Each structure stands twice: as structure tokens, then as C-alpha cells.
Amino acid sequence: MRRLNLISSILTFVIRNPKALLIALLVGGLSYSYEVFIARDTMAFAGIPKAMDNSIPTYTRIFRNSAYMVGYSDIKGNPLWVVYKLTPPSENASRLKRPENFNADWRNFGFIDSNDYTNSGYDRGHMAPNHAISLLYGKQAQIETFLMTNITPQKPSLNQKLWQRLEEIELESFTSKFKEVWVYTGPLFDEKITHLKSSRFVEIPDAFYKIYAGIEENGTIKVLAVIVPQNAKTNDRIEKYIVINEASGIIHHQNRRQCH
């Protein structure tokens, strides 16, 4: 209510002061141009994802955070894509305590909050990973990974097992092979729409993808992509779900103990 009253007061002031309106439009235009043409490009590898089939509801609003960027679907109550960059972590990097709470994102008008997942049978699954982001980018960036616009429904057997192993491998192994690793990740949906039993606003994904682009010191790019179904078994090998592998053994024998 206070926020609505504040917005109403600001609008009333602007309408009664035409010069203020012109200044507001100018500042807003410059801010938008900076966001779209400069800021976003620094946080995405090869640009913002585009829809290949306009018949599919893929409209997203883009939210830029300290260490990752989100293409969020209000229709599905899910991030359709999240992009972040990994680099080799410093040996002196602080291991920060995990935040206790998930938070509604004000940019989503608080439409989805943590309670939407309560008693749903699904975990609040991070797309931009808490641990890696905290090691590389610090406390504020870590807190932002607990925004609900970074969260998607994952079965506990996936979120706490195979998906977690993927996050460990990308941070510990992939970053040791490349100068930097760009990651695009998000949920996939089939034609049948199913929502959380605890919320009619959050659609349940059928699978999840991760696309890795590893940049070598000489600029060579190696690509790896995986699609992991929601019902993946906890002891499945990650190699089973590779759909693109141009990474010359990016998942090598040393890691295979972790991939079982």
C-alpha cells in the first residue's frame, strides 16, 4: 500500500509539472538505452536468447542482477533462461553461509514468492547457482540467487543429486580448463501444462538444459549442452544427457566418479 501511494504521489507531481515530465522521459529513455544496448551485452555470451518459434509463448522480461541475467516468463512463473559467467575461483575466496530465505522479486511485483512452493512436493531449484555465484561475486550476488525469479520447480531427487553434481563439475572442473565459462540454463516444457498443486501460477517443467561455452586463452570456444529430465535417476551418468559435445572431453575420466 505504501508503495502504491508513493507511485501515485510521483505520478501526480509529474503530471502537474510538465518540465519534470520531460526530464523524466529523457532520463528514462537514456536508462533504457543503456540497459538494452550496453549493460545487457556485458552479461551475455553471443547475445540475448531469441525465440525460434513465435507460436510458442516465450515472451520474457529481462532482469539484470549483479552476477547473472534472467529472461523471466510471467505466463509460466519460471525463468525461461538464465545466463552467468564462471571463472576459476580464487584460493582465498570466502565460503559464505547460505541465506535462510527465498525472496520475492519486486520487479515481478512480488507475484511469485516462496510460499507458492510450500507443500508442493518440489524443491525451489536455483538456475544461477548459489555456491558458485557466492564464491566468485560475493554476498549481495549470492542473495540475488535467492530471488524467486531465479527459481524453478525441481524434484528433490534431481535438485539435490544430479543437478547439484552438474553445478559442482562446472565450477571445479570446467573452470580449470578454460579462462571463462559462460552458462545458459533453464527449464523446458512439453505441450501438457501442469502447475504446482500449491500454486496455479507456477508451471512444472519437464526437463532442464545447460549450455556451456568454454573460452580458452587463445579465444577458441568449446561447447557442451545437456538436457536433464525432471525424472532423472540420482545415479545416472551425466554423459547420458549430453546433446552437444564440441568440448574435446570437457567431461573427462577424472570426473566420471562424480558423474555416476
Residue ranges and their predicted role:
Residues 25-27, 38, 61, 95, ...:
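Short linear sequence motifs
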Residues 106-260:
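Domain-level detector of nuclease and nuclease-like folds
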Residues 2, 20-79:
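N-terminal module-boundary/linker segments of secreted carbohydrate-active enzymes
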Residues 63-124:
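Short, His- and charge-rich active-site/binding loops that engage polyanionic ligands
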Residues 10, 34, 41-48, 102, ...:
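Generic hydrophobic, helix-prone segments enriched in Leu/Val/Ile
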Residues 1-15:
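N-terminal Lys/Arg-rich, disordered targeting/topogenic segments
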